[in-house]
From Swiss-Prot:
Role according to the record: RNA-dependent RNA polymerase replicates the viral genome.
Protein name: RNA-directed RNA polymerase
Keywords: Nucleotide-binding, Nucleotidyltransferase, RNA-directed RNA polymerase, Transferase, Viral RNA replication
Name of a matching Pfam family: RdRP_3
PROSITE patterns on file: RDRP_SSRNA_POS
Keyword Nucleotidyltransferase among UniProt keywords: yes
EC category: transferase
GO MF term list: nucleotide binding; RNA binding; RNA-directed RNA polymerase activity
UniProt entry tagged with the keyword Metal-binding: no
Segments forming a coiled coil: none
E.C. no: 2.7.7.48
Record organism: Groundnut rosette virus (strain MC1) (GRV)
Amino acid sequence: MATIRHIMDWLRPTFTPLAGVKSRQECIAHYGDDWALMITQSRMTLSAEAQVNAWYEGGAEVNGSIPSVEGNAAAPQAAAVVAEPPHPSPAENEGEDASWVAALPAPPTYEVVQGRAPTLEEIHGASRLQIVPYTGRARVIGEDEVLPSPVLSSIWRATRCPGRILRVLGTLLKPGACQRHLEDLREVQPQVCVGNPCEVKLQEEGAPMAYMNAQSIAMELRAMFGWQAATPANRELGNRVARDILRDGCGATREQIWYMSSLALHMWFQPTLCDLAIKAGAQNFLVGEVYARSGVETKTRPKILSPQIKVKLAARPRPVKRVSYNVDVLGPSADYGVHNNSLNNLVRGVNERVFYTNNQGKLPLAPAAGAYQQIDCAALKQFRVTPWSLDDVWMSYKGSQRVRYKQAVDSLGMRPLSKSDARVSTFIKAEKVNFRAKPDPAPRVIQPRDPRFNAVFAKYIKPLEPLLYKALGKLYKYPCVAKGFNAVETGEIVAKKWKMFANPVCVGLDASRFDQHVSVDALRFTHGVYRRFVKSSEFDKLLRWMYTNRCRGAAKDGFVKYTVNGCRMSGDMDTALGNCVLMVLMTRHLLMSLGIPHELLDNGDDCIVIMDQEHLAKFNDAVKPYYSNLGFTMKVEEPVYSLERVDFCQTRPVYDGKKWRMVRHITSVAKDCCTVINWEQLPSWLSAIGECGIAVAGGIPVHNSFLRYLMRVGGTKGGIENHLLWKNEGLSWYRMGMDLSHEKVVSDEARLSFQTAFGISPTMQRALEDLYDGLGAPTVNGCDYRTVKTRDCREIECMPPRHYNHYFIDCGMQPAGSQEQYVNPGYTIFEAAALWAQC
């Protein structure tokens, strides 16, 4: 009874729960009848919400004893005499008088039917009006369904008549005339009999009502029928049973029966914290619900479309939708997804990544005349390249690429190579994009040439590549090109370069859309470097065909055609090599001309420069104008003064107690939980990610436990590493045949170095590792994801933020934790084998 009394007490004129809280009668005296009634209504609503909050939080008793109906009937009560209804005579039953038909009400007119409110069947559907039997299975609920909110159930709110509401609003417009207007507009209200003037005998409540509450009635409904959906049929069932319990079992009065049964009904459908923990388990929190994240359509429309782009709609458009599968497990804040394969995305990608730098038609920088002629590359060691045979080319590939290039080589035997084979086929890259960091970036496009052209071009580029990387590397004391080195070798190289300077500082160079800014002059300079080592007229012809690119892009619902001069085609065989040649030689020329002693490390368009701090200002003043003169927009990143804070290819060096190695950013945890392959390949993909990652990150805080979790919950790896999308992960070069999976113990040195690198304290590191070590397999609707089909996976528009994302926030560098003193300078002449022996 306390449940309803706490709500109804506010109607009593003199009731006040605490000193200083005005009663209803005092509110009438101070604010008038209208405002007093609204205040009372608000107080009653808050009291009702408090009861529902107590149900949600488990703060109310739900095990109050409910006497059985039979026991209640045995109690001495004055039984009411009920007259037996008269039965019709046989003659009446056999009569055929149909006069009752005429007495039936007439059916509604057409106008009435058209103006009526929709029925429940029309609103909810007939299927929702059925009573759902209790199945005993757990109902999966999302975190957003059960988080506390100001109003946790839809409690009915009484409202005053419109005329009274308008009068109250009028007082707000003219505060000074509030009381006068209320007096002028006061209606003659009908007299209502209050109290008990006729001495009507009132109902007496049964003894159980002294302790009974709505929460106990709601739990009784749960015990009888389970936790059901709030369909109209289930509402009718629950309300009827609750009224029977209160009337026949507890001896409740009419008022108590109605109000308490209504409140108990809301609680029956309202989930509690215990429901979340028991019914839904740990879904959407730690176990990792698997979601199908919808592909993304760019919302940015080009304000200026390049006149070179010709757009054509497909005659028979196909579905453009792509889906990425995300494991919503404990991890940093991220929302990884993939762009749809649509004409809309393709047009923006080509427009902003080939012709313009934004959607407003801003052209990329053009190099100054003769700018590349000043770059000296005479220091490169001379060597001669022996071309491969075409059979060597296709045999160097695996999987589907091997089949494709074998077919291309066979076709070259029947039809010679022509300029038309140099045409470019463009498509939207199925790239994992963090849409929380970049809400609407321009989609990236891949622009490969025909396999026939690539097969012939590979005859020269494949043997040239490793030799030219080595020649570039020997421009410095330690290698300046990271290609060919694994994570440990790269970490040792960075550490040794750092140790060469008394007061080192590292500056990262980030070229904005590097491929787009590779002009014809930049291509001619790069090809001039190639020709120093490859002497072939066929090779020269292939290089000339790359200056003007005729491209055709395809999406599921349309096509584009365009022609562009220059630009690095992202699918070209020499994309990585050409970018390394440009960045190393351009940056080296700048620093040499400034007279700054330095060390360089490059991987494509990702470049870092290490120097003494005294030269930093001179370098910063010169770097942007220098690259602008060459046609590049260069962003100079913030300098770092601690070895562990050096950013290179989304990794940072960490010392594990024995050696330095490059460790991926902590955001890789979220990225590894996203995949864009087929659902059936998801277990194999997770297993491959874990196995490849642990080969490099064994013994590294957080990563060690997370990657072993992926291996534990994945499936058989199979041939997933031959998948075309595997290259996008970038783990192959990161590993390079290394296996440190046997290193399972995380050293104290590793924890301190990891804290300096990523700002996660050793205490938080251990807490995260304990969570990953205890996690089971990801789920779909409460079932192991390996046992369900893709149709069972819930599709969402974006990954929801979680309250545990802040566990991974960088809390700042801890200089005391840096392990820079453990750098071994090594030998003057660097060789990879010698470096590995030192590790």
